[in-house]
Curated annotation (Swiss-Prot):
HAMAP family for the chain: Ycf4
GO terms (BP aspect): photosynthesis
Similarity comment text for this entry: Belongs to the Ycf4 family.
Entry's transmembrane regions: 22-42, 57-77
Protein name per the record: Photosystem I assembly protein Ycf4
Gene this protein is translated from: ycf4
InterPro entries: PSI_Ycf4_assembly
């Protein structure tokens, strides 16, 4: 989702709050609860399965799955990776904001001057896992990714996005 005017372009980044992450977190949570229940029932001498070794292994897998699902749910709650890109022509500043894990530096804010932008770069890696990533090259620094690395974009979509951004920022496009 993005908002654009003549002088300002704001693009919202969803981060970890995607439908697939919600789905996997809840499937893993309820599946691990079932494993814990079966393991506990076998420990309490219910005739589902023998406690040693099947019940112990199922309890271990249930506890492991519970921790992983709590990690995924906490990432969803904190919206890790979410934020925005703001391109402001009036001030000549680009702001890239992201939420990261809680702590002292929970907010990640990068600011650059528009005059320091060298180009908008499209990096394409073909093969079994085709990857197309849009980068912003800045003088004296590495390229900053503007799209998620796991985001699957068609060549037309990424070219359109790069062309719009390059025309808004008045910089060239590079394709690698």
């Amino acid at each position: 989702m993005s908002w654009r005017s003549e002088q300002i372009w704001i693009e919202l980044i969803p981060g970890s709050r995607r439908e697939s992450n919600f789905l996997w977190a809840f499937i893993l949570f309820f599946g691990s609860l079932e494993f814990i229940l079966v393991g506990t029932a076998s420990y309490l001498r219910q005739n589902l399965i023998a406690f040693f070794p099947q019940g112990m292994v199922m309890t271990f897998y249930g506890i492991s799955g519970l921790f992983i699902s709590l990690y995924l749910l906490s990432m969803l709650f904190w919206n890790v990776g979410g934020g925005y890109h703001q391109f402001d022509k009036t001030r000549g500043v680009i702001c890239i904001f992201r939420w990261v894990f809680p702590g002292r530096n929970r907010r990640l804010l990068l600011r650059f001057f528009m005059k320091d932008i060298r180009s908008i770069r499209i990096e394409v890696k073909e093969g079994f896992y085709t990857r197309r990533v849009l980068y912003m090259d800045i003088r004296g620094q590495k390229g900053i990714p503007l799209t998620r690395t796991d985001e699957v974009l068609t060549p037309v979509e990424i070219e359109k996005k790069a062309a719009e951004l390059a025309s808004f920022l008045c910089v060239p496009i590079e394709v690698l």
